[in-house]
Amino acid sequence: MKSLNVILTLLSLIISVLSKKVYYEAEDGKLNGITVFKELSGFSGKGYVGRFENPGNSVTVTVDAPATGMYDLSIIYCANMGQKINSLTVNDQSVGDITFTENTKFETKDVGAVYLNKGKNTIGLVSSWGWMWVDAFVINDAPNAAKDVSSKLNPTLVNPKAIPAAKKLYDFLKTNYGKRILSGQVGAAGQAGDEGQEIQRIQKATGKLPAVWNMDFIFESNDCTWRPQNPDITEMAINWWKKYEGKGIMAAQWHWNIAGKTGDFAFYSKDTTFNLENAVTEGTWEYEKIIKDIDRVSGHIKKLQAVNMPLIWRPLHENNGDWFWWGNNPKACAKLWKILYERMVNYHGLNNLIWLWNGNNDANTPVDYIDIIGVDIYANDHGPQTTAYNTHFDFYGGKKMVVLSENGRIPDIQQCVDQDVWWGYFQTWNSEFILQDSYHTDAQLKEYFNHKTVMNMDELPSFNVDSYNGDSGSSHNGNSESNSNTGNSDECWSINLGYPCCIGDYVVTTDENGDWGVENNEWCGIVHKSCWSEPLGYPCCVGNTVISADESGDWGVENNEWCGIVHKSCWAEFLGYPCCVGNTVISTDEFGDWGVENDDWCGILN
């Protein structure tokens, strides 16, 4: 192990040497519709740029990266004309909107990590709100370590009385977070589990159904005078739940229609005179009105709880903007969230809810009443939205799962994986966002839904359980008869239960028999084998990518830890082909099953 320790020491020294800040002056970049100024004091270089008066105005600098990876980025700016939001691009792809707090002098805005290729890259700032000044872009001249997204997640739901089905769903999401990204789709307004044009497009293009389905209680308030004919939204959701035997995930938002003393009911601020501040003040008629509406929607959700159906619940969504009546006062909105929670959980006994906050991240955010964080992004491209993800992840210190609760374009899945942008799930809005080729072609949908990282409905367990012991993130559909083999021996114990052996060791669930995984859309038993590196204090590698070698053997890195590589022989090696790491069968002949890995045929060990 001496050589391995030397390598680790050298890596640490290299990173410490390279991890310095490199400044790229904005005035030296490519300017579109903006000019160089020198009036303000405190700038570096030959000046600064602004003012970003018109849409599309931009500054772009070219930066050098010594290696491919994630790099911390900051922007030196001045926003003396008020808080501004403008868009960041990397290599001509949108990575998210950046909020620049109002100030009176040049200050540094930490943007977070961005993904850079080895060599030349472009970083740009494009006018959205505009009207600000940029002095320089600053990156660390060494890539960051891989992000640990799951180890700090809150272990349980905020509601200690959550029903077993909700606990199981949360554990399932938690177990897969940082490993898989679930697919999702928003249905038509007022519908639940409908398999209309959105689902039909997905299924036709991909052969898959989304893991997460979304409904909207948009018509379920007392002021709303129009709602669909029977069956109502609750009946539709229950029918969907029964049809798929609990093997689906339902999410819901509430476009809360309400009327003030004058005017019609609405959820947009501009269309209702309803007052949020009064609504969270006990004794007002506005307070009494919201309580009656909460009671109404709780009656619907209570029916879902009666059939053991958990629900990812997203009320007061997009409260970081002022376009909805509940979003124009962060402090009052946070108070309304707590009123919702207390009324629904403690008064109505709704324990099937997983609470998703989709809005402000500030001192008012009701962190102790939140399970999951949602972000809504309607981007102009399929970028992974790295900056938006990192901003929300970092605000909660990695304790809350971050999901795309609404998206226009699905982010490129492979880019998400490469850049450690682990959205728990994506959830595409309905209508043209999923139906039109200008947003998604059939080829893109097929690529994204069939990506090995994406989990669709066919891989979900049933969440319809009356009890749950909390020791797994999923369940398998095999029988539960006892087996003396517990997965700790080299013999494949699952064959006796009618399931194949896993090639990898990705644990999806555990029961009295042993550990279970999913490969080729089928449950398989995981056999935990020992290897030469374990006596040295290091686990066995699942893959076989060699990073280093010493007198002990070959070493790889997995899960940010060194591991020992075990070189197995298989029948294919005698024919001049390597052994497969996975077990996806492409072809079969007289020798056995064949797969393709690293653009080469390989033999599958059965």
Swiss-Prot record:
Ranges of residues in domain CBM6: 22-140
Record-listed substrate binding positions: W285, W323, Y378, W493
Pfam family, one: Glyco_hydro_26
Active site: E318 (proton donor), E406 (nucleophile)
PROSITE patterns registered for this protein in UniProt: CBM10, CBM6, GH26
Swiss-Prot/TrEMBL catalytic activity: Random hydrolysis of (1->4)-beta-D-mannosidic linkages in mannans, galactomannans and glucomannans
Record keywords, A-Z: Glycosidase, Hydrolase, Repeat, Signal
Gene3D superfamilies in the cross-refs: Cellulose docking domain, dockering, Galactose-binding domain-like, Glycosidases
One example GO MF annotation: carbohydrate binding
Domain CBM10: 491-527, 530-566, 569-605
Chain residue ranges for the region called Linker: 472-489
Annotated InterPro entries: CBM10/Dockerin_dom, CBM6, Dockerin_dom_fun_sf, Galactose-bd-like_sf, GH26_dom, Glyco_hydro_26, Glycoside_hydrolase_SF
EC number(s) recorded for this UniProt protein: 3.2.1.78
Domain of life according to the entry: Eukaryota
Signal peptide range in chain numbering: 1-19
Single GO biological process annotation from the record: substituted mannan metabolic process
All residue ranges annotated as the GH26 domain in the record: 164-458
CDD domains: CBM35_mannanase-like
PANTHER family linked: GH26 DOMAIN-CONTAINING PROTEIN-RELATED, MANNAN ENDO-1,4-BETA-MANNOSIDASE E-RELATED
Domain text: Consists of a catalytic N-terminal domain linked to a reiterated non-catalytic C-terminal domain.
Protein function: Hydrolyzes 1,4-beta linked polysaccharide backbones of mannans, one of the major hemicellulose components in hardwoods and softwoods. Shows very high activity against mannohexaose but not against mannopentaose and smaller mannooligosaccharides. The major products released from mannooligosaccharide hydrolysis are mannose and mannobiose. The reiterated 40 AA domain is involved in binding the cellulase-hemicellulase complex.
Family per record: Belongs to the glycosyl hydrolase 26 family.
Name of this chain's protein: Mannan endo-1,4-beta-mannosidase A
Species whose genome carries this gene: Piromyces sp
